Each structure stands twice: as structure tokens, then as C-alpha cells.
Amino acid sequence: IIIAIYYSAEHVWRGRERKIHEIADATPLPNWAYVIPKTAAVSLVLIATMLISVVSAIMVQLGKGYTDLELGKYLLWYVVPNVFPAIMIAVLAVFAQALSPNKYVGWGVIVLYIVFQIVASNVGLEHSLYVYGQAPQVPLSDLNNAGSFWKGAWWFRLYWAAFAVLLLVAAHLLWRRGTETRLKPRLQRAPARLKGTPGLIAAVASVVMVGTGIWIFYNTNVLNEYRTRDENERFMAEYEKKYLKYENLPQPSIADVKLVVDLFPAERRAEVTGRYLLRNLTDKPIRDVHVRETDRETKLLDIAFPGARLASHVEDDGYRIYRLDQPMAPGDERMLTFKTQRWNRGFRNSGDDTRLVENGTFLNNMELAPAIGMDPSGLLQDRVRRREYGLAPELRPAKLEDMSATKKSYVGAGWSTPDITLSTEADQTPIGPGKKVSDVTQKGRRTARFVSDAPILTFFSIQSA
């Protein structure tokens, strides 16, 4: 940014500082013949700086004896994605200088842009639709490459590219010719300069920007849930106030779990049917059973709990309380069945789900199925923010002297023998906990069943790649 600030001012104001601007401005060259080359020059300086960093990184690799340089990844994963922000900065820098009466005011405009980027998140403007040139980060891996994550980033880039074109048109309209540097007279002449090709370009860019903006909003805010940082913190604070009081409430343990997981990697979708055998391992009767959705990405579509009625359910919280018709005595067992779905539709503004991907899915049971009972993990941790929301300064672990805490671990108190049937695309390998007892490929699907031959803690994962 510093390079763009300096060189844009030098390019735009050099003629005036050397007193040759009246000669150049008297030529029949159109304004765009000044704007475009200067923008391209600043862009090339920034891109050259980036390429120098690539050469430096390669030299470090070679100096350490590493010869598998993978130049294609330098190009596709570093150079190409960063060319766009370089051009965006160059356009903004040249526009700021075209707008300003002198280069120092232009520098001030760019500084204001930098300050805005820093404080935008603090005033609720975190969405990439509001921050110039910003696009979501693209998660990269050797196994999945960029997957489908690149699509959202390029939609944002198209949106901001259209806006950058509007800035270039504005720079063309406001470009100084002759001795006049005041903004007001240039604004008065702008409508006349907008006629013809500049107006057509501005109209097309406006249509593209509005169209892509609507599409981006539909994906990030309709197909997917979008929350600002403050909204997310407020949600966690309210969630804690409602449900943390149930943390030490006696709950049944999962004694046996059976899952049928159908993965559709190309769609980044998982359909799960499950069954829990719940057992009361406490020494007290249990009247209420708390069922909690532990992952925002996974939706609990259906649940059946014979012998119980739904006493409380807040859908946005994903928290259900069931009142048993007959309390569970110590040692009693009950059956609970459910259906869940995890489906990554469209693209997001940030925080992409990298657990369920085209190649390299890795999901644990808490990301596929509901949990029993309340757990403090995932709540607001920052002490300052907790005080602002009227919460205790921090969530402390149980004291060493608290022997009741030994009755439950991070993943619950009981042990279970998972029975997992996992299906995926025919060209991928499914992996689950336990011993593989069957593996069949038919109709383009590969289905494997895994059964644990010994009890394990109810915390396991499945993979497909």
C-alpha cells in the first residue's frame, strides 16, 4: 500500500511538478490515455514487488537444499490471487490523486481508506461487500487444492472489479487539464465527459456490480448464515445465560451408537441417520434429557424419543429439553433416533467449512450428531468481552477437590461401541472407527461398515478421500 501511495502520486503529479503539464494537457489525448497507463504502471510496480518475494522464497528453499519448488503453486496459490488486490490498490490510489487538488490530499485520502479497513469491523462493516477489494480467503491443501472455495472469492473479485472500473471512469471524468485543480469546476464538467463510451462503460460496470452484489448476498446471507463478530458474541453470551446452568445436571450417557452416514463430496453434503442407546450411569433418577446441536453447520432434521415429550426447544439455539414420562432410574436405558444434514450450499463471506470437502473429508461425531447434556466448550472466552455482557470473568475448570467432576470427561462419562455405515463416491476410500466388516461398491457408491470390537469413548471421526 505504501508503494502504491507513493508511486501513484509521483506518476500523477510529476508533470505538474516539472511545469510541463500545460504542454501535455494541450494535446488531443483523451483523459483515459492518462488514467489507464498510470494505473497500469502502479499495478506493475506492485506485481514486480510480489514477484521479487517469490524469487526470494525460492532462493531460501534452494539454500536449504529443497529442490521440489512447485512453481505452479507459487503461480496459482500466491501470484494470481494477489494480482487482483494489487490492481485494486493501484486503481484506488490513482483515483484518489485524480480527485485531490494536490498529492498530499491524495495521500490523506488513501490513509483514510487504510483507517477504514482497520476500524470497519468495529462498526459492524465486516462483510466483504463493504470493504473495498476484499475477498474471502481460499483454504488450500495438497489433498483438495482450492476445492470449490475459489468460486466465492472470484465472485467478490468480479464485484470489486466492476467498482474499480467505476473509479477509473470517475478518474477519467475528474482528470485535471490545464491549470484548473479545483474539484467543483471538474464536477460541473463531468456530465458532459460522461457522454458516449465512458457512460456506456459506467452503465455496464454498474449492472455487473449490482448483479454480482445480489448474487453474493444471496449466497452469503440467504443460503448461509452470516453474523458479525458482535452478533456472534451476543449469541454466545445469551446462550450461556440460558443454558450453562444445566452444566452439572445429571444426564444419561451414550452407551451405544449406530450411524448411517451418506457422504456426497461433490455436493459437500452429508446425510446422517443415527440411533443412541442412552443409559443412566448416575446414582440419581433423571427426569429431563437435554439434546444439543453442537455444530452450526449440521442441522437436526428429525428426532424421535419414545417415552418423552418436548418440553422446551429454541430453534436458533439448537437446544432441546425432553421431559420423560417416567424418570430414568440408575441403570435404566432409553432409545433416541435422529436425522441430521450437513450441506455446504453456495459460498460464504468467511469461515468456510473445510471439514466436508470434495476430496479429504474429516468429520468427528460431534459434527454429525447431537450431544447429550450441556458443555461449556465453544462459549465466549475473552475476559473483557465477558464482562461487557455481564458474564463471570472466565470459565474455570473444576477444582481438584471437586470429585463430582471425575464422573464426566470432555466427551461424556460413558463408553460405547460404535457401529458406523459410511457411504461415499466410488473413487474415494471411506474410513471409520473400529474393524471394517464389509466394503461394497455398486451404482457409483462405495459403502463400508465399521464396528468397534471394544468399548471406546464416544468421540471418533470418519474420513473420505
Positions of predicted regions on the chain:
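N-terminal, polar/Ser/Thr-rich
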Residues: 198-268, 380-392, 408-412
